[in-house]
């Protein structure tokens, strides 16, 4: 973390008890746009990686349904027949997804720092992610790849250390957070960004909403691309378990462990400045998806988001 970020966060913390949230939120947003957006743009220019808004992302949309592929263990219970159905729709994987043999149409991943206790990133995780990208570069050469969180960590981050094989069809996105401690504050923040067209359908954009985890970004991308249905697969969040830890199906990666498996996934746990993903999804459904006429579903009920998010009708997998 840079000295500038530390100073700004210290200042914001000192203002928390003195400023109303609506004003604090605006100060934080303007600072983030000025500092982190500029840093993301500078990194893109320095490395010669195009920004996402140079690409007409609407050209990727073939269907009205987007399947989002997460890394929870329920992925391993999806039948071959269902995978055949999923393959007939547009798909977006994120973060650890390349460990899976199914290659999606889009792939989102974070420009993680080399090591950061605050970001829950260890040096081991960084090395594992980089090796994963190298091993899967050929399979993902024609996949549209979007790297996020570029403006947060500055020099000590993945975008400056990407394998050259990973550069084809790679784009930089700027992730826009809000500052919120409660559902009410999050609602205010999302309404603020909504007025700034962060959830408006568009052919070109590079500003992506993100709060609590990558799932919020991909849901917002689905809305902006004009999908009518978004189906979440492997978004379990019950424990810190991943599909690639199955010893029978994934013997090469089964020993990987980035946190105690018995603990709930960190995105499902509330923190001082981060409400749980269940609340984030609830607010997004109410404030963004429902007004836009977008339906959100789960592939199965093995998720901390159930029963808030319904299970998709089985007929969708018929092909």
Each PLM stretch: what is its role?
Residues 3-319:
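Metal-ion/cofactor- or nucleotide/acyl-coenzyme-handling active-site neighborhoods
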């Amino acid at each position: 973390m840079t000295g500038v970020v530390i100073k700004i966060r210290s200042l914001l913390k000192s203002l928390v008890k003195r400023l109303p949230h609506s004003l604090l939120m605006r100060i934080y947003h303007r600072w983030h746009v000025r500092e982190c957006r500029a840093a993301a743009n500078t990194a893109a220019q320095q490395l010669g990686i195009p920004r996402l808004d140079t690409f007409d992302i609407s050209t990727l949309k073939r269907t009205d349904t987007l399947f989002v592929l997460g890394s929870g263990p329920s992925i391993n219970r999806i039948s071959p027949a269902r995978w055949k159905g999923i393959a007939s729709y547009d798909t977006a994987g994120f973060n650890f997804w390349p460990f899976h043999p199914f290659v999606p149409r889009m792939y989102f991943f974070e420009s993680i720092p080399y090591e950061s206790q605050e970001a829950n990133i260890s040096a081991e995780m960084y090395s594992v992610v980089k090796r994963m990208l190298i091993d899967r570069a050929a399979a993902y050469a024609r996949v549209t790849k979007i790297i996020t969180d570029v403006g947060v960590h500055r020099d000590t981050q993945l975008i400056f250390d990407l394998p050259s094989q990973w550069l084809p069809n790679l784009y930089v996105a700027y992730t826009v957070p809000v500052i919120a401690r409660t559902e009410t504050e999050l609602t205010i923040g999302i309404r603020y960004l909504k007025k700034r067209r962060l959830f408006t359908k568009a052919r070109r954009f590079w500003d992506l909403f993100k709060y609590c985890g990558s799932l919020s970004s991909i849901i917002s991308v689905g809305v902006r691309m004009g999908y009518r249905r978004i189906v979440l697969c492997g978004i379990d969040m019950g424990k810190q378990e991943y599909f690639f830890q199955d010893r029978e199906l994934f013997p090469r990666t089964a020993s990987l462990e980035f946190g105690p498996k018995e603990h709930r996934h960190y995105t499902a746990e509330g923190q001082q400045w981060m409400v749980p993903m269940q609340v984030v999804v609830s607010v997004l459904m109410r404030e963004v998806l429902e007004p836009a006429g977008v339906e959100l579903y789960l592939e199965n009920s093995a998720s901390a988001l159930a029963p808030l998010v319904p299970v998709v009708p089985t007929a969708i997998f018929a092909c």
